[in-house]
Amino acid sequence: QNHNEAMKQCNNDYNKTAKEGELNENMAKYELLKQEGRAKRGTFHTVHGDIQTPVFMNVGTVGAIKGAVSTDDLKEIKCQVELSNTYHLHVRTGDKIIKELGGLHKFMVWDRPILTDSGGFQVFSLAGLRRIREEGVTFHSHIDGRKIFMGPEESMRIQSNLASTIAMAFDECPSSVADREYIEKSVARTTRWLVRCKKEMERLNSLPDTINKHQMLFGINQGGVYEDIRIKHADEISKLNLDGYAVGGLAVGCLLYT
């Protein structure tokens, strides 16, 4: 409940630019079908097909659903959008290999929308294995221990190689117990990283060898448990007129109060 205003701000600013816009190479179209209070029912039009919202995204971290679930099975259960992870596909299989194979859709044999997480959550979950700088994050692979650097530009390049429908911005996922001073610095850095993500995504979408030139970028709202920081951050990032926004940092060990 503390984050309702932040989510409302993101929704309002996105709807102003998207709900009346035509689907084109720079922006998807969100069609609002029904609204009651803050609850919304809509259709999100993408280059890989429509998504009826609200929606549950089936998670295929490394390009496959666990439990021997095939993409035919996903269609059978009416899956509208599949979620894969940038970090995991980068360290194992490899995003460059997937690009050579025609992108994640062909790799998976899946023709519906795919959302790729930026890898930020996984990187920042490796607390003892990473170092944060303004440029990005240096960390060690959980597979073989090799040193890897990932920043906003690297995350966008990996996701462009994967050619997903929706790419998530590279952000910092601070601990829920981080103090206010750290959260403020972290959020400011996440905003600067988002500007870099947008610039790099626009560049990548213009390249002749890019598989999905209509790849969309979603920003991520952060702010820990501080409502005022989240509202301010939502207002700042909504001005970038991105294709969509997410509310992040709600599953990084938030404390349970009784």
Regions of interest found by a model, annotated:
Residues 7-9:
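Short polybasic linear motifs
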Residues 91, 175-177, 225-228, 252-254:
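Flexible loop/turn segments at secondary-structure boundaries
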Residues 161-162, 189-217, 222-252:
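Alpha/beta enzyme core
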Residues 257-258:
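Conserved small/polar residues in nucleotide/adenosyl-binding loops
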